[in-house]
Amino acid sequence: FGSLLGICLLTQIITGLLLATHYTADTTLAFSSVAHTCRNVQYGWLIRNLQANGASFFFICIYLHIGRGFYYGSYLFKETWNTGVILLLTLMATAFVGYVLPWRQMSFWGATVITNLFSALPYIGQTIVEWAWGGFSVDNPTLTRFFALHFLLPFLIAGLTLIHFTFLHESGSNNPLGIMSDCDKIPFHPYFSVKDILGFMFMLLPLTTLALFSPNLLGDPENFTPANPLVTPPHIKPEWYFLFAYAILRSIPNKLGGVLALAASVLVLFLAPFLHTSKQRTMAFRPLSQFLFWMLVANLLILTWVGS
């Protein structure tokens, strides 16, 4: 899945650059500039659909990548694992600020709700929120800085990916049996390159199918309406890939408690290397651990469903 994530990142950066050339980071023009891109720019609709649905595939791949690492004990490469978790956090931040850019109903209210969570921090919370907003509400300054961040962060992700690679090459990669990988040290081309191309085909086929046939399947219908600060949508919710965390946030009646639980739901990944007690590295021969792992997967799926 690592190679697929690389392709995702490349696709997102290319489509994103093309979209940025037609985008206007201004509250009065953002929505219509996106509509203009879809209607009047050659293949603008395709570029936008690939960008929007590419994000979904990026998260599908990263969740599978993390799950696979969890199952096969890859977290014992501590540096590789920790840089990976930092990559996940950066990706989540990038997706969040990018979601706000078209300045639609759910974008606007999602940004308002999520940035407002920082106000739960004691003493400094309110100041941080107003500083992030650039005022007393989500408005033009917020949109401008979110665009700047959304442009910058993917390149930070690319840089972190190289660090991730460097640490991985220190140790060599893991395998399903959790034993030495020396026998896998074969020429990259044609062996691994052909294996990767198969993966690319398996990912790019559903991505193009989704982008061409039902590009709005995973989106929110509220997003066809331009942002209106005076009308709150009946239920505010993020994109599907954040629903598990959002469900955890919403299930706790206390604001600070919810924020801490939301943060913990992702940051708990940092603890994985310290919680490994087994003599065996992978779960391949540990039925009880396998059971707990699949319980975790089921739990996340149920949270995603409940969150919507």
From Swiss-Prot:
Q: Where in the cell is it found?
A: Mitochondrion inner membrane
Q: Which domain of life is it from?
A: Eukaryota
Cofactor stoichiometry and binding?
Answer: Binds 2 heme b groups non-covalently.
Chain positions recorded as a ubiquinone binding sites: H169
* InterPro entries linked: Cyt_b/b6_C, Cyt_b/b6_C_sf, Cyt_b/b6_N, Cytb/b6-like_sf, Cytochrome_b_C_euk/bac, Cytochrome_b_N_euk/bac, Di-haem_cyt_TM
Q: Which UniProt keywords apply?
A: Electron transport, Heme, Iron, Membrane, Metal-binding, Mitochondrion, Mitochondrion inner membrane, Respiratory chain, Transmembrane, Transmembrane helix, Transport, Ubiquinone
Q: Please give one Pfam family short name.
A: Cytochrome_B
**Residue stretches spanning the membrane:** 1-21, 45-66, 81-101, 146-166, 194-214, 256-276, 288-308
Which Gene3D superfamilies did the record assign? Cytochrome Bc1 Complex, Chain C
Sites binding heme b b562 sit at H150
Task: List residues binding heme b b566.
Answer: H65, H164
Which co-factor is required? heme b
One GO biological process term is:
mitochondrial electron transport, ubiquinol to cytochrome c
What kind of membrane protein is this, topologically? Multi-pass membrane protein
Q: Which family does it belong to?
A: Belongs to the cytochrome b family.
Q: How does it assemble?
A: The cytochrome bc1 complex contains 11 subunits: 3 respiratory subunits (MT-CYB, CYC1 and UQCRFS1), 2 core proteins (UQCRC1 and UQCRC2) and 6 low-molecular weight proteins (UQCRH/QCR6, UQCRB/QCR7, UQCRQ/QCR8, UQCR10/QCR9, UQCR11/QCR10 and a cleavage product of UQCRFS1). This cytochrome bc1 complex then forms a dimer.
Other notes:
Heme 1 (or BL or b562) is low-potential and absorbs at about 562 nm, and heme 2 (or BH or b566) is high-potential and absorbs at about 566 nm.
Stated role: Component of the ubiquinol-cytochrome c reductase complex (complex III or cytochrome b-c1 complex) that is part of the mitochondrial respiratory chain. The b-c1 complex mediates electron transfer from ubiquinol to cytochrome c. Contributes to the generation of a proton gradient across the mitochondrial membrane that is then used for ATP synthesis.
Return the protein name.
Answer: Cytochrome b
What lineage is on file? Answer: Eukaryota, Metazoa, Chordata, Craniata, Vertebrata
State the encoding gene: MT-CYB
